[in-house]
């Protein structure tokens, strides 16, 4: 009986630790790199619900993404907005540290970023989405 209780408690704790791994990814219906980014997250253990929309700008503004930080797609995960092709290390850092910001963004569609083809030409600057003006959250 004790072994069953321990196993059940351990299973429930493990599930709670990974509850932030549920993501909703909003994208333009015709965009293929967004699907590649969703697959990148899935390979890392995230459950990703891809939501095609023709109102992507509306989604971005509703979640307080400034136009200067617009990325290819908008992902909602763990109570944060993740804009664009943000690398997994930075995404996981956000979800672990839980800073008091709205989210993070890798603006544009930089070559070599997760889900994009091509060669990375230099470090990526990932910015905070917050009330502060364009603070760098991470460089990868």
Residues covered by each model-derived region:
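N-terminal export leaders
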Residues: 1-2
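Compact recognition or signaling/catalytic modules
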Residues: 6-8
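N-terminal signal peptide c-region/cleavage motif recognized by signal peptidases
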Residues: 11-13
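Local sequence-structure signature of Cys/Sec-based thiol-disulfide redox active-site neighborhoods
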Residues: 17-44
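N-terminal, post-signal-peptide region of Sec/Tat-exported proteins
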Residues: 35-78, 83
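Thiol/selenol-based redox catalytic cores and closely related redox-interacting motifs
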Residues: 62, 68-140
């Amino acid at each position: 009986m004790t072994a069953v209780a321990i196993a059940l408690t351990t299973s429930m704790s493990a599930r709670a630790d990974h509850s932030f791994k549920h993501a909703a990814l909003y994208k333009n219906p015709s965009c293929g790199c967004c699907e590649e980014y969703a697959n990148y997250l899935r390979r890392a253990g995230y459950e990703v619900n891809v939501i095609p929309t023709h109102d992507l700008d509306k989604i971005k503004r509703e979640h307080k993404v400034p136009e200067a930080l617009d990325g290819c797609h908008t992902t909602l995960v763990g109570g944060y907005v993740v804009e664009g092709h943000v690398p997994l290390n930075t995404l996981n850092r956000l979800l672990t540290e839980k800073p008091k910001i709205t989210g993070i963004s890798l603006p544009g569609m930089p070559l070599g970023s997760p889900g994009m083809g091509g060669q990375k030409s230099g470090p990526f600057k990932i910015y905070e989405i917050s009330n502060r003006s364009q603070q760098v959250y991470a460089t990868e």
